């Protein structure tokens, strides 16, 4: 009755409302004179009461269950699900935990889940190396060098990807395909490897040269920086001397012999690069780089691209988006524009409408269109600078300046009739409007103007949209750098081009189709800081 009374919302003196409704008046009066609880309820409440009374007391606490009382098999499963960095603290709790943490099953799972090691680790038993040794002395110790890096090789730069490969940590140098085959896959060669073949410590081996692995050294200088050193550079030498080394390097780097290269200036550039890069003997300093963060409203997915750069061959460029602009930063470079510099910048506010196919062949017509847009951009910048100067005096101390990644809003451009032009809205609006014909399968025909040189004549003949941009040019040794106008042409999700107006040259870029682990920036601010750092090294 007491339970029923609580459910019905009445006190114990009133009785059960549902039971009263079922009974007549006489039965109800009799029921009101009876106790509110039946014998069974009295027994339950009496057993829970203190001193045998009807007043209910606190329930006794449930019996405690210690982790120490769990079977070892269950403890192994629990410990194996924890991050490996937490397990040393767990081993200090008691002797039983420390003994269980010697179970290789735990460390085998941590190697697989944290570092992707899918090898059959049981074969390590032959060498006497445990999975715990692999985790602690190899994977965890060198975890800070996993990811993408740029070597400090003067203006040339490079792209190093350090990965866990089976029971090894290997540093792969990624190389562009041979010029001018920009759509071919990337090439790569190992520069060093780290493995654990004995229980004492991990072994670092230099892989440079053609005589197999030999002794090397790795030093983690500071956060996001490490260096490699070869202790047996004689393994890099070839029996035929420098001439044989140069011929071998040329065949690997360019896929041809010096006799195949008829351009004298190109021969000089190739020889200069060989002399400069070979002097390092794989003793290099690397700085971490991140892949650019992406947003749903980006023009295309940002990332790494291979691009044609005339006599310098193919180079690696990172495309990233920064508000109303897109930037192409060199990961590899040359004596004119070194690695780390911003090779192209695209103004997503200023679309360029190409003329019909016949007029596209006329370089003067394309030049006229681009220069008109450049003049419009200059006027907007002057107006924006004047407005910024007037507003600077009124700016309060709490008002923040826009960051480099979020440029100040510029005045919308005007069309010939005084109405806002198609390049005056938000970048997302311009991109959406430009993508409409492309999504309907109505991509605009495209052809290079007569007189514009291209290393690759097999460029797409249909484009989605074009934007005004600038390209960085300079003399040898990065002297007298200046930004010159050009046209950014978006072909598809994986290819774009840039017409260098002043050079009368065309660069074609194709996406690097590779998956990189441990390469995402922890934040957009960290990515912007990384760009500043690699640019400052060659400025």
Curated annotation (Swiss-Prot):
It is linked to Intellectual developmental disorder, autosomal recessive 45: A disorder characterized by significantly below average general intellectual functioning associated with impairments in adaptive behavior and manifested during the developmental period. MRT45 manifestations include mild to moderate intellectual disability and dysmorphic features, including coarse facies, broad nasal bridge, fleshy nares, and thick, prominent lips. Phosphorylation at Ser-278 by ATM following gamma-irradiation results in its stabilization. Phosphorylation at Thr-419 and Ser-480 in absence of stress promotes its ubiquitination and degradation by the SCF(FBXO46) complex. Phosphorylation at Ser-33 by AKT1 promotes association with CDC20 and ubiquitination by the APC/C complex. Ubiquitinated by the SCF(FBXO46) complex in absence of stress, promoting its degradation. Ubiquitinated by the APC/C complex following phosphorylation at Ser-33, leading to its degradation by the proteasome. It comes from Homo sapiens. Belongs to the FBXO31 family. Changing residue 343 to V: Abolished ability to promote ubiquitination of amidated proteins. Residues 64-110 form the F-box domain. Pfam families: Cyclin_D1_bind, F-box-like. Substrate-recognition component of the SCF(FBXO31) protein ligase complex, which specifically mediates the ubiquitination of proteins amidated at their C-terminus in response to oxidative stress, leading to their degradation by the proteasome. FBXO31 specifically recognizes and binds C-terminal peptides bearing an amide: C-terminal amidation in response to oxidative stress takes place following protein fragmentation. GO terms for biological process: anaphase-promoting complex-dependent catabolic process; cellular response to oxidative stress; DNA damage response; mitotic G1 DNA damage checkpoint signaling; proteasome-mediated ubiquitin-dependent protein catabolic process; protein ubiquitination; SCF-dependent proteasomal ubiquitin-dependent protein catabolic process. Changing residue 334 to N: Found in patients with an autosomal dominant neurodevelopmental disorder characterized by developmental delay, hypotonia, intellectual disability, poor speech and spastic cerebral palsy; likely pathogenic; redirects the substrate specificity toward non-amidated new substrates, leading to their degradation. Changing residue 311 to A: Does not affect ability to promote ubiquitination of CCND1. Highly expressed in brain. Expressed at moderate levels in most tissues, except bone marrow. Zn(2+) binds at residues 206, 214, 230, 236. Keywords: Cell cycle, Cytoplasm, Cytoskeleton, Disease variant, DNA damage, Intellectual disability, Phosphoprotein, Ubl conjugation, Ubl conjugation pathway. InterPro entries: F-box-like_dom_sf, F-box_dom, FBXO31/39. Its main location: cytoplasm. A motif (D box) lies at residues 64-69. Changing residue 419 to A: Decreased phosphorylation, leading to impair ubiquitination by the SCF(FBXO46) complex. This is F-box only protein 31. Zinc-binding is required for the structure of the protein and facilitate folding. The destruction box (D box) acts as a recognition signal for CDC20 for degradation by the APC/C complex. GO terms for cellular component: cytoplasm; cytosol; neuronal cell body; SCF ubiquitin ligase complex. GO terms for molecular function: cyclin binding; ubiquitin-like ligase-substrate adaptor activity. Residues 377-397 have a biased composition (Basic and acidic residues). Induction: By DNA damage. Increases after UV irradiation, X-ray irradiation, oxidative stress (H(2)O(2)) or addition of the chemotherapeutic DNA-damaging agents etoposide, adriamycin, cisplatin or fluorouracil.
